[in-house]
Regions:
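FIC/Doc superfamily catalytic core
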Residues: 1-179, 183-297
Length: 297
């Protein structure tokens, strides 16, 4: 509990710094968002067992030919998700999240992959299973999602990390679609974060084991501690990255930082993983913003 409370307090502090640093820098913020799309797409698809690497994902989005055969499905998965990620970056500020919005996002995601199921919830008789979890009866989907959104909105006084964690677990437990639930669920997280004035998060493929443990915890105990930690760390990581750029820090790798200041690299990595230093993961590499006259640790 103490760890989660610390993350809650850290987020509030980082958010205030971000608003100060972001003033008059909308063009830089836009560039950071655009540069992040490929990483968002790669990680979200990789969690769902896509074989694409980050480099291959970037090439597909830039319409560059790849060196190996890629299925048409994986190509559309990358392009469609990139379109959705870019769409919500502006749309979330204009439109409240509703079931109709969720259906639209799903239609954009699954188009040209499974047009027969794109943009609709599971119908009567369409059951789905994820590992040992059998999703609720299709007849319950709409009611469960309406209750999920109502609960999220009613708890506006709660910390955003707790609200996002609970909503995400509830959405994935419901598994309202035949396909695309995980990717849409992570998109919804960012839709709500952006709408509430926070920065989007990127749940990393390297955290997949912990991510699935969060679902197991929720199903078996009804608790959300692990997902709170995942969302909290992802949010601090996102703020650390943006603040490094917006505050004009010199951005170097943690390996370079360790060498320059004669600090244990493995110790820095451990701190970065816990997000107890202002490090951030960018394209699979841990980095940190070095500021003059400031202790970065």
């Amino acid at each position: 509990m103490a760890k989660i409370l610390h993350i809650f307090n850290t987020i509030n502090s980082l958010r205030k710094r971000y608003y100060i640093a972001a003033a008059g820098k909308q063009s830089l913020i836009k560039l950071l968002s655009e540069a992040e799309v490929a990483e968002q797409v790669y990680n979200s698809n990789a969690i769902e067992n896509s074989t694409l690497t980050l480099e291959e994902t970037e090439k597909i989005l830039l319409q560059i030919n790849l060196d190996r055969y890629i299925t048409e499905r994986e190509i559309f998965e990358a392009k469609n998700l990139a379109r959705v990620v870019s769409y919500i970056d502006t749309r979330a500020k204009e439109q409240e999240l509703t079931l109709d919005v969720i259906l639209l996002l799903h239609k954009m995601l699954i188009a040209n992959i499974r047009d027969d199921i794109a943009g609709r919830f599971r119908k009567d008789g369409e059951w789905v299973r994820v590992a040992s979890h059998i999703a609720p009866d299709p007849k319950e989907v709409v009611e469960r999602l309406e209750k999920m959104l109502a609960g999220y909105n009613a708890n506006s006084h709660e910390n955003i990390i707790k609200r996002i964690a609970l909503l995400h677990l509830t959405f994935e437990y419901t598994h309202p679609f035949i396909d695309g639930n995980g990717r849409i669920g992570r998109v919804i997280n960012n839709y709500l974060l952006i709408r509430e004035g926070f920065v989007p998060i990127n749940i990393k493929f390297i955290d997949r084991k912990m991510y699935y443990e969060a679902f197991k915890e929720f199903e078996e105990k009804g608790t959300i501690r692990i997902m709170e930690e995942i969302v909290g760390k992802a949010l601090t990581n996102s703020y650390h990255k943006r603040l490094a750029y917006l505050e004009g820090a010199q951005i170097i790798t943690l390996a370079e930082y360790a060498k320059k200041y004669k600090i244990s690299h493995s110790n820095l990595i451990n701190k970065a993983n816990r997000q107890t230093i202002e490090a951030f993961l960018e394209k699979g590499v841990w980095k940190i913003g070095v500021r003059q006259n400031k202790n970065n640790l």
